[in-house]
A protein has these predicted regions:
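Conserved PLP-binding catalytic core of the aspartate aminotransferase-like
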Residues: 255-256, 260, 266-301, 318, ...
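Active-site phosphate-binding strand-loop segment of PLP-dependent enzymes
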Residues: 105, 110-175
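N-terminal small-domain helix-loop-helix segment of the aminotransferase-like
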Residues: 1-64, 71, 351
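PLP-dependent aminotransferase class I/II
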Residues: 15-17, 190-268, 273-275
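Short acidic capping loops at alpha-helix termini that bridge into adjacent secondary structure
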Residues: 55-59, 79-82, 171, 189-190, ...
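PLP-dependent enzyme catalytic core of the Aspartate aminotransferase-like
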Residues: 297-301, 310-351
């Protein structure tokens, strides 16, 4: 479905600055389109090395971080391979593991009633699951999609030290949080960090992601990556986005402020529980009203959120992307009327 207020895919509501887009177009126009892009995008790799503080030979770029995830799992997962994840989490991990013949080892996330309520990683249970299953791969999304939960670097390091199995930290939303696992790469050759340009960097439409790891791991993952996987338009746009880091960082600060404003407002809305988040989205739990009815009622008011009721432990939840102030206000208004339409008395908080 489409709606004027589209807050269902965790996109950045603000585009790359116009001047940066024009620089990209000029650069692309100067190249012959009949030629392949660079097999090794050195300009982008060097820009990413400066941006991340990690060596260029330890960076692999992909057509979105989804491609990097797929290539990584192709060289690490086969029939019967165990992969540990905490759930609920990004569904692509399980999808790719299943396609490759692997087996998921699922560890339920914990939950704190708050206030504010939040989902929590249970690191002890993850460690127990790794040891019991002898899983060679553990994947952690931090901040986690769809719960917004972060895993502290000390906990990541604990996972890395517990055997030589691969620890994969998906940091697609790391710009919205305080923590990153990248400084641990130097000490832990079994650590892999994944990132994307689709969220904070405003390039969802151009599909650019990257993987940070030891050069040895990168060389192995490259064997599963298709050649010429990133067109030169996307390469140029990614470099331009990195050159606009100050403007994009300012947008991140605005989104974080909006996230906290909206979560505070939701604390006064009866019938819903909002979960704290370190990302550019958050979960709301419909305590009395049917969440699917609430979703449909908001869509009738041209506000599109994400129905995540099929996820484990989220049977009554919707996921909401933080948008502009106007979009967020439209969401708050639509939610109030949607709760009423879904059969709930907002004034009393009872069905």
């Amino acid at each position: 479905p489409k709606a004027p207020v589209k807050i269902n895919q965790n996109e950045n509501p603000w585009d790359l600055p116009e001047a940066a887009k024009r620089r990209v177009v000029e650069k692309v126009l100067a190249r012959p389109w009949c030629r392949y892009p660079d097999l090794v995008p050195r300009d982008l790799l060097e820009a990413l090395a400066r941006h991340s503080g990690w060596r260029p030979e330890g960076i692999l770029v992909g057509n979105g971080s989804n491609e990097a995830i797929e290539a990584l799992l192709r060289v690490t997962v086969g029939p019967g391979t165990k992969v540990v994840v905490s759930e609920p989490t990004f569904t692509l991990y399980a999808l790719l593991t299943r396609i490759l013949g692997g087996e998921m080892v699922r560890v339920p996330m914990g939950k704190s009633a708050g206030p504010p309520a939040r989902f929590l990683y249970d690191v002890d249970r993850v460690l127990e699951a790794r040891r019991a299953s002898e899983a060679p791969v553990t994947i952690v999304c931090s901040p986690n999609n769809p719960t917004g939960t972060s895993l502290e670097p000390d906990d990541v390091e604990q996972l890395c030290r517990d055997g030589d199995g691969l620890v994969v930290v998906d940091e697609a939303y790391h710009e919205f949080a305080a923590a990153t696992a990248v400084p641990l790469l130097e000490r832990h050759p079994n650590l892999v960090v994944l990132r994307t340009f689709s969220k904070a960097m405003s390039l969802a439409g151009l599909r650019v992601g990257y993987l940070l790891a030891s050069p040895e791991i990168v060389r192995e993952v490259e064997k599963a990556r298709l050649p010429y996987n990133l067109n030169f338009f996307s390469q140029a746009a990614a470099v331009a986005a990195l050159e606009e880091k100050d403007a994009l960082a300012a947008n991140v600060h605005r989104l974080v402020a909006e996230r906290e404003r909206v979560l505070a407002r939701l604390g006064d809305v009866p019938g819903v529980r909002a979960y704290a988040s370190d990302a550019n989205f958050f979960l709301i739990e419909c305590l009395s009203a049917d969440p699917k009815a609430v979703f449909a009622a908001m869509l009738r008011r041209e506000v599109l959120v994400r129905d995540v009721t099929s996820y484990p432990a989220l049977e009554r939840c919707l996921r909401v992307t933080v948008g502009t102030a106007a979009e967020n206000d439209a969401f708050l208004h639509a939610l109030g009327t949607a709760l009423t339409e879904a059969g709930m008395d907002v004034a009393s908080g009872r069905a």
